[in-house]
Every structure is written in structure tokens, then in C-alpha cells.
From Swiss-Prot:
The GATOR2 complex is negatively regulated by the upstream amino acid sensors CASTOR1 and SESN2, which sequester the GATOR2 complex in absence of amino acids. In the presence of abundant amino acids, GATOR2 is released from CASTOR1 and SESN2 and activated. One of its GO terms (cellular component) is kinetochore. It comes from Rattus norvegicus. The modification Phosphoserine is found at S184, S309. The modification N-acetylvaline is found at V2. It is found in: Cytoplasmic vesicle, COPII-coated vesicle membrane; Endoplasmic reticulum membrane; Nucleus, Nuclear pore complex; Lysosome membrane. This is Protein SEC13 homolog. Belongs to the WD repeat SEC13 family. Keywords: Acetylation, Cytoplasmic vesicle, Endoplasmic reticulum, ER-Golgi transport, Lysosome, Membrane, mRNA transport, Nuclear pore complex, Nucleus, Phosphoprotein, Protein transport, Repeat, Translocation, Transport, WD repeat.
């Protein structure tokens, strides 16, 4: 059984939509309909407010930490159609960049693996996905995938930089030939896989169809070097699917139904070793799932938060969400 190790009183004045631990598990970022982003030091079970970031003009849906090799950087996205990138300099958090290239709510932000540099994917209700790449001296290059999802994009998640099968296939000392990929989920009930071509343009590689309602979240599992790629998806239809691909071409994906919940499922998140999946939904519960030896997914923990958002507490099983 997973126990709650800390409960953080964020003092947000409205619903909390996301809560993310940083790389080291010492800082917690939260965002809310009160238009604010807050950062807490949560070491040793404490909760010290480090920053209260104001810059959005609408509900803030999601936050994402960049890899610490680039400093303390946090991205946030909002109903106000903006993405803001915040950076800590000399102990003070400030806005370092604002992206206003979408025509509707920006629902999801996700940093690429650090091996690629500072690249942020952003999914919007206008149906487009934008990719922001830091080019140095405060400048960001923007690429846009228009009409990525009809009606809107709800979630983006990068594939790991580790090449599938590299643990057993990669010649010693040879640098892997990385191919940038990410997954997206949208209001067209689809999961789409995208890859960067040699000319730098992004191409739709695959459509994954299984959900019967809006896809609310997608999460590409971390790679541990084995020759399998795995993606989790969840939907307004209450279902969570685990998608696996074993072939080198990356074209043959097979879905397995993890569970059919009685309410919308908002988020899915992998443990850092990719063997446990956290699922949170409209029933105010976080459930943890693990694949058994016979290939079936079983619930190993059911944490009922009672009243309030499921994002407001941190459990041991979710600390390595990033």
C-alpha cells in the first residue's frame, strides 16, 4: 500500500489543475484557475513557498520542469492562449519568455529529452502544436504543426531519447542516431505520433485509434533500453489503454485496455522505471497499476483523496513523475 508522505496547503484560491515535482524531488510546482503558478520547497516533508508567479490572465492548466542542466526553468500554459517560460536567477523567479502564437487555450506543455537541447512542445485547443527551441541569447525558434488535431489538442508527451533496444543492440562507444518523436492526444479521439524529418519539419507518423471520446492525456513511458516502446493514454470515455510497439520500424502499435473507470480519466503518469502507472480521474482517486508476469495490469494501490483535487497531495509512487 502506498502511503501519503506529504500534504501541501497551496493556498490557491481556486481549483488546482496540475502539480509537478522537479528532477530532484525537492520542489513542487502547482497551477490553478486562480491564474497563478506556485513553487514550494518540499524537502523533509516541509512546504516553504518559494515563488508565487503571476503573468497569466486565465486558468493555468499545466506546468513542466526543464532538465536542471539548463538551470531552474519552468513552463506553464493557460486558457489565456499563452505559454510562459519562467527561470530562476540569483534566487528570484522571473518570466524569461512568453509565447503567444496560439488562437485558443494552450492545454499542455512538455519538455523534450535534455539530449536534444531546450525544446518545448505545446498543444492547443486551436488544433495546433507548437515547438519552441531555445537558440541562445534569449531567443526561441518556433515551429508549428497546424491542424494536428481537429477541434483541439489536449496533451503532448515526448518519446525518450534512448533508442529502443539500445541496451542490447548498440555498439560500444557509438553515438545513437536519435530520431525526435512525440505523441499527442486530442478532441478527435485520436492519439497521433509525430517525428522530425531530416529537413527539420514534423510529420505525422501514426494514428492510434481505440478511444470513443476526447483523449485527455498521453504519456510515453521512459525507456530502460529494452526493444519495446510503450505509451499510456486516457480519455473522457473512462478508459485507459497501454500501447506497445515491438518492431524496429515503430509502425505496429497494439492497445491493451488497462481499466474502464466510471468517470473521466484526466491524467496518466509513469514511474521513472516505467513499471508503475499512476492514473487520476474524476472520481478523486489516484490508482497505481503494475504489469504482472502474465501481462495483465493490476491495481496495486488506491489512494482516495476524499474532498478536493487529486493533484494536491504527493504520494511515494508519484514522486518520479518527471
Amino acid at each position: 500500500m502506498v502511503s501519503v508522505i506529504n500534504t501541501v496547503d497551496t493556498s490557491h484560491e481556486d481549483m488546482i489543475h496540475d502539480a509537478q515535482m522537479d528532477y530532484y524531488g525537492t520542489r513542487l510546482a502547482t497551477c490553478s484557475s486562480d491564474r497563478s503558478v506556485k513553487i514550494f520547497d518540499v524537502r523533509n516533508g516541509g512546504q516553504i513557498l518559494i515563488a508565487d508567479l503571476r503573468g497569466h490572465e486565465g486558468p493555468v492548466w499545466q506546468v513542466a520542469w526543464a532538465h536542471p542542466m539548463y538551470g531552474n526553468i519552468l513552463a506553464s500554459c493557460s486558457y489565456d492562449r499563452k505559454v510562459i517560460i519562467w527561470k530562476e536567477e540569483n534566487g528570484t523567479w522571473e518570466k524569461t519568455h512568453e509565447h503567444s502564437g496560439h488562437d485558443s487555450s494552450v492545454n499542455s506543455v512538455c519538455w523534450a529529452p535534455h539530449d536534444y537541447g531546450l525544446i518545448l512542445a505545446c498543444g492547443s485547443s486551436d488544433g495546433a502544436i507548437s515547438l519552441l527551441t531555445y537558440t541562445g541569447e534569449g531567443q526561441w525558434e518556433v515551429k508549428k504543426i497546424n491542424n494536428a488535431h481537429t477541434i483541439g489538442c489536449n496533451a503532448v508527451s515526448w518519446a525518450p531519447a534512448v533508442v529502443p533496444g539500445s541496451l542490447i543492440d548498440q555498439p560500444s562507444g557509438q553515438k545513437p542516431n536519435y530520431i525526435k518523436k512525440f505523441a499527442s492526444g486530442g478532441c478527435d479521439n485520436l492519439i497521433k505520433l509525430w517525428r522530425e524529418e531530416e529537413d527539420g519539419q514534423w510529420k505525422e507518423e501514426q494514428k492510434l485509434e481505440a478511444h470513443s471520446d476526447w483523449v485527455r492525456d498521453v504519456a510515453w513511458a521512459p525507456s530502460i533500453g529494452l526493444p519495446t516502446s510503450t505509451i499510456a493514454s486516457c480519455s473522457q470515455d473512462g478508459r485507459v489503454f497501454i500501447w506497445t510497439c515491438d518492431d524496429a520500424s515503430g509502425n505496429m502499435w497494439s492497445p491493451k485496455l488497462l481499466h474502464k473507470f466510471n468517470d473521466v480519466v484526466w491524467h496518466v503518469s509513469w514511474s521513472i522505471t516505467a513499471n508503475i502507472l499512476a492514473v487520476s480521474g474524476g472520481d478523486n482517486k489516484v490508482t497505481l497499476w503494475k504489469e504482472s508476469v502474465d501481462g495483465q495490469w493490476v491495481c496495486i494501490s488506491d489512494v482516495n483523496k476524499g474532498q478536493g483535487s487529486v493533484s494536491a497531495s504527493i504520494t511515494e509512487g508519484q514522486q518520479n513523475e518527471q
